[in-house]
Amino acid sequence: MKIRDFDYHLPKELIAQSPVEPRDSSRLMVLNKSIEHRRFSDIVGYFEEGDTLVLNDSRVIPAKLTGKKSTGGHVEALIVSKSGTGYECLIRGKHIREGTRLYFGELGATVLEVIKNEGASRYVVKFNCNGSLSDILEKIGDAPLPPYIKQKLEDRSRYQTVYSKEKGSIAAPTAGLHFTNELLRRIKEKGVSIAYVTLHVGIGTFTPVKAENVEDHRMEPEYISISTESAGIINETTGKLVAAGTTTVKALESSCVNGKITAKEGFSRLFIYPLYSFSSGIDAMITNFHLPQSTLLMLVSAFAGRERLFAAYSEAISNSYRFYSFGDAMLIFR
């Protein structure tokens, strides 16, 4: 299977630059036996008593830092993950090498020192700062918005789901951005169970597929946690099992043993693309419209069927749906 099989043309004006208000006023394309055009708030009507909705409660950390080198040159750093006694970072700037010191925050009080160059703008660094790194990031860090979003986000909470809890993602699980607390309340009132899983979105979100053959791509590890309670709720589902987002699908598939969800804490490199055999019993998934040639588009193609999905994307473009992180949503039934 070739990477070009997952390419499509999207007019730039359809790339959403900001979220809609309220959250659930975004458009919803329902892909079932036919295509329906709705608002996200209408999703309540597709749930029935006995269904279970699974949500990823990961919270985005303000992991993007903007600062200067000792020479005064501008630099940006994205904190990716813990790495031994240091942290793995993506750093944008010229002449970054081992021993380089970078300065962030008021009067450059937070100092980052490069201790290893791993190539492709990836570095292992150590921090010299007063207080915990988590607290420092909350004070001086920014939401790590995707590069295709050029507009400044005034309200950082709009890049968080209303139910986000567990800190650790460097990108939002965007399918969940459409939910409001009121919408979740209405869904529960229908007799729908809600289960939470955690998958921290990692560097793989920013890593393009460079292999010509899709099968040759290797995913970066992502942290997953599913509690015994959540596994029980999911396994006791008598109606439809609905997963909100590609991250939730990946978490469920990564923790499924003999058709049952098991409690899990660890890392997953699971790569889902067409011809993958789903085992967790997901009946429907909620997702946004994804970038061409991305692993997220491949996952959704595996779930919906590539030709079926690309026909839906073509109709979405014709109907001026908004794409990507702050864009509109799909509800896809298998």
Residue ranges and their predicted role:
Residues 1-334:
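Surface-exposed, charge/polar-rich loops and edge strands
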